[in-house]
Amino acid sequence: MSQVILDLQLACEDNSGLPEESQFQTWLNAVIPQFQEESEVTIRVVDTAESHSLNLTYRGKDKPTNVLSFPFEVPPGMEMSLLGDLVICRQVVEKEAQEQGKPLEAHWAHMVVHGSLHLLGYDHIEDDEAEEMEALETEIMLALGYEDPYIAEKE
């Protein structure tokens, strides 16, 4: 049976009201075992300052963002199950959910699904890549019991 090992790091000034570790595990389990047998993923939940700093350093964007994905590149000849790290900004996720009229839990789930697909090599730079990735995200979110996260864009 496929297994995803979660290393959850809560690095917010206030960690109250965040999803439970079991929820993060459920969301990861809905994505990663479809693509590989055994994986280890770190999810770090941060405040805006850390998200802003990482986004500026690694993407050249001078603002915080919802989720950053850092895939782990295994050196040639080595076998490791470490897939990578997700850094999710609490305040951005909460603000986006409110602005988009989405349930907060569903938006958290979407950020984990979206980021996990990036760790697995999916991207949305080109239109055809975006369509494939969004279709997978929608399929996974529906399987988890949430609405299509892109429903507003399709209407």
Curated annotation (Swiss-Prot):
Q: Which GO terms describe its biological process?
A: maturation of SSU-rRNA; response to heat; ribosomal small subunit biogenesis; ribosome biogenesis; rRNA processing; transcription antitermination; translation
Q: Which Gene3D superfamilies match?
A: Metalloproteases ('zincins'), catalytic domain
Q: Name one GO molecular function term.
A: metalloendopeptidase activity
- This protein is called Endoribonuclease YbeY
What is the source species?
Answer: Escherichia coli (strain K12)
Report the protein's function. Single strand-specific metallo-endoribonuclease involved in late-stage 70S ribosome quality control and in maturation of the 3' terminus of the 16S rRNA. Acts together with the RNase R to eliminate defective 70S ribosomes, but not properly matured 70S ribosomes or individual subunits, by a process mediated specifically by the 30S ribosomal subunit. Involved in the processing of 16S, 23S and 5S rRNAs, with a particularly strong effect on maturation at both the 5'- and 3'-ends of 16S rRNA as well as maturation of the 5'-end of 23S and 5S rRNAs.
Instruction: Fetch the HAMAP family from UniProt.
Output: Endoribonucl_YbeY (MF_00009)
UniProt lists the gene as ybeY
Q: Which family does it belong to?
A: Belongs to the endoribonuclease YbeY family.
